[in-house]
């Protein structure tokens, strides 16, 4: 009873578990959790029903309470989130009519176990010196010179920035017409240029992309490329162990190597990708690949630069919205969270979170092979069961015959079988 009260005081609560015994199933009450204390702070990891991610959970919990104790503040790391230029709101928006109106409630929830997000309107306030990083997510309106100077000053003083910048912005569509797109000029281009990075005002399309099978047929989403392990930086904390990352409406990222000496390409599209700013219709069946084969080739879509500060540039903000951020299981969500960890100097969290993950997609180049795998998946198990059952039945009959022949050869059934076999042999002769 004393231990139960102590566990309750530490924030660990009982759960009912079912276990299999010789007499059947039984239920028991168990306290499965870990309590960590440091100074005046106590943190609990409750309901540990599995060892999955336990190292990551323990390490991040220890880091949070050390951060709180040593800095005499809240346990969560604080991250700045720039607002005032049409950036995505940190709440869901079920009535969104365009990409720019999509909400990021999923992003807030994704980061909530480690980070608290502080919204900052640069037109009204400075960037707090206590922040390690800021996120600039999907601006579609220009920054003033004063606001750009605040960002540059923050970077010069060792601050880190995570940019999610869209290459094109959607113009209001006229009635019964398709959306139009134009270059997304925000003024941040001057800051990125200082690091040798620029985003071309085009969308990247890729044949290695999200494909959905519906009653109407195969739906190909060329503007949602899938980046596999062979096209990510395998040793960088953000992308190590990751593959099968789904991106969305990305732009080509160019790197000036004379300025970006420490640049790392985090992700690039496949050899079957191309970029364009003409006749853009983001609807399956309306994407036309170029006729010139020289226009195909990999495009950089995410880059990191580390000098006195850490800069991560992702050429789309849509991957942070509720379209793709829904739980914490997909490679896209892990990529986004790793990027936030990286600019907050929590590189160790990245590797622990993705350790042992198998998130790459199976590469099937032939449609016939895909059909064969589909049929095998649907009917293969049933076929195997039938074959095994037939083999077991034949083995049982053979075993019965051998036992009877050895121990009871005078059995009338044995004599009849031998007689039938002999007669069949004579007829064949």
Say what each PLM segment does.
Residues 1-429:
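Short, surface-exposed patches at the edges or C-terminal ends of soluble domains, predominantly
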């Amino acid at each position: 009873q004393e231990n139960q009260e102590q566990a309750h005081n530490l924030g660990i609560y009982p759960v009912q578990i079912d276990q299999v015994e010789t007499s059947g199933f039984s239920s028991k009450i168990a306290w499965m959790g870990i309590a960590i204390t440091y100074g005046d702070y106590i943190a609990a990891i409750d309901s540990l029903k599995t060892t999955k991610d336990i190292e990551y959970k323990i390490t991040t919990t220890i880091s949070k309470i050390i951060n709180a104790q040593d800095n005499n503040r809240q346990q969560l790391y604080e991250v700045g989130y720039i607002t005032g230029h049409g950036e995505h709101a940190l709440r869901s928006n079920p009535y969104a009519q365009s990409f720019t109106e999509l909400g990021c409630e999923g992003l807030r929830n994704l980061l909530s176990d480690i980070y608290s997000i502080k919204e900052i309107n640069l037109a009204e306030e400075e960037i707090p010196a206590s922040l390690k990083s800021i996120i600039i997510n999907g601006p579609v309106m220009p920054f003033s010179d004063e606001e750009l100077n605040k960002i540059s000053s923050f970077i010069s003083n060792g601050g880190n920035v995570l940019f999610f910048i869209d290459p094109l912005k959607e113009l209001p569509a006229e009635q019964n017409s398709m959306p139009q797109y134009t270059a997304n000029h925000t003024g941040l281009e001057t800051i990125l240029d200082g690091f040798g990075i620029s985003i071309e005002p085009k969308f990247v399309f890729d044949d290695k992309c999200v494909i959905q099978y519906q009653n109407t047929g195969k739906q190909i989403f060329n503007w949602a490329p899938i980046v596999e392990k062979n096209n990510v930086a395998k040793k960088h904390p953000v992308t190590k162990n990751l593959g099968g990352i789904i991106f969305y409406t990305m732009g080509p990222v160019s790197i000036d190597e004379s300025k970006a000496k420490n640049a790392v390409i985090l992700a690039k599209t496949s050899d079957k990708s191309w970029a364009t700013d003409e006749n853009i219709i983001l609807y399956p069946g309306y994407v036309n690949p170029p006729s010139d084969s020289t226009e195909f080739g990999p495009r950089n879509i995410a880059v990191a630069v580390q000098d006195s500060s850490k800069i991560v540039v992702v050429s789309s903000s849509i991957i942070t919205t509720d379209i793709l951020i829904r739980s914490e299981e997909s490679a896209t969500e892990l990529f986004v969270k790793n990027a936030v960890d990286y600019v907050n100097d929590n590189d160790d969290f990245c590797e622990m979170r993705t350790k042992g993950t198998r998130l790459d997609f199976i590469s099937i180049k032939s449609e016939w092979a895909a059909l064969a795998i589909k049929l095998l998946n649907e009917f293969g198990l049933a076929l195997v069961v039938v074959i095994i059952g037939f083999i077991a039945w034949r083995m049982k009959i053979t075993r019965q015959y051998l036992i009877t022949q050895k121990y009871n050869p005078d059995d009338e059934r044995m004599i009849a079988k031998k007689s039938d076999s002999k007669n069949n042999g004579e007829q064949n002769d």
